[in-house]
């Protein structure tokens, strides 16, 4: 069984986004793994496995507009079900 159930992915569009600061925030304030934050000051892609995807969305929405949001249940996927 997966330790972290939800594969959470999204884009953040904003101004003066800081990839390193976003990465540091998740490492310090969120439980999860497979964290990926890539982009530039205008657009950041987030990928994170967590049990609390709503917290990821809430934080990212505080930074700018969020879109292309995907939250997949990896436990369901491992059972051959739609995530």
Which residues make up each language-model segment?
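N-terminal loops that bind phosphate or other acidic moieties
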Residues: 1-83
